[in-house]
């Protein structure tokens, strides 16, 4: 896999607060190689390492996108939800930004059944057929549709498990990460100083609580995916 230049600068990472970790009491000793200092009771992430692993992640997603692979972006906490949806839509990726339903990947047949139900209800609603039902029946189906839209709206076009999963918060999305490990799906994960860097295929040391930090990381990955997709379109 060829290495490319992704315009990753230490200055912009510092401005985004990527280097700010958690308090020194809330840390995972496995993160020691990725921490450069302590400052006012918090750990400071080594941004040189962040740049290196972010660049590797961009290389990976570019290569995968250039071969037509499918991506899933997962980030369900409030700070990340909107950023995840925007990034995924921009790069034509699937996403989960509300609750992760246990077994979403490992029990794919159940997820597929839910997706079929979701698509059928959307078709019926668009055709106006729900409004022709008795009020009680229509209300029940509309509630089902609303719930399915909330939890499955970001994966409504997904027809199989993804080829690569991008995880915004390791601890928040631990169940999703474990499902990927079980299925052998490659993962890219933002890891703060309280995380385990060994759980993902590519771990990017970064502040996973600051909106600016999450946005910058996602923007770099999305740009690489879009570039890869353009390459795939030009050279199918």
Swiss-Prot record:
UniProt keyword annotations, A-Z: Chloroplast, Plastid, Ribonucleoprotein, Ribosomal protein
Signal sequence extent: none
Gene that this sequence comes from: rps2
BP GO terms, sorted: translation
Lineage, opening ranks: Eukaryota, Viridiplantae, Streptophyta, Embryophyta, Tracheophyta
Organism domain of life: Eukaryota
Protein name: Small ribosomal subunit protein uS2c
Gene Ontology CC terms, in alphabetical order: chloroplast; small ribosomal subunit
Subcellular location: Plastid, Chloroplast
């Amino acid at each position: 896999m060829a290495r490319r230049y992704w315009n990753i600068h230490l200055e912009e990472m510092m401005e985004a607060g990527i280097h700010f970790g958690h308090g020194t009491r809330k840390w995972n000793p496995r993160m020691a190689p990725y921490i450069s200092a302590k400052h006012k009771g918090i750990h400071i992430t080594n941004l040189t390492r962040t740049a290196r692993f972010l660049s590797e992640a961009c290389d990976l997603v570019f290569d995968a996108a250039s071969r037509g692979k499918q991506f899933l972006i997962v980030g369900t906490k409030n700070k990340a939800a909107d950023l995840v949806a925007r990034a995924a839509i921009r790069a034509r990726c699937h996403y989960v930004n509300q609750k992760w339903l246990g077994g979403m990947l490992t029990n794919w047949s159940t997820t597929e059944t839910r997706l079929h139900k979701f698509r059928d209800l959307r078709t019926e609603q668009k055709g106006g057929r729900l409004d022709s039902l008795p009020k009680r029946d229509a209300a029940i189906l509309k509630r089902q549709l609303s719930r399915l839209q909330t939890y499955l709206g970001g994966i409504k076009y997904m027809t199989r498990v993804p080829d690569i999963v991008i995880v915004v918060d390791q601890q928040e999305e631990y169940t999703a990460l474990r499902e990927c490990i079980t299925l052998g799906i490659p993962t890219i994960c933002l890891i703060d100083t309280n995380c385990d860097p060994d759980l993902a295929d590519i771990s990017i040391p970064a502040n996973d609580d600051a909106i600016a930090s999450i946005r910058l990381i996602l923007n770099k990955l999305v740009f690489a995916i879009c570039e890869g997709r353009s390459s795939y379109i030009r050279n199918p």
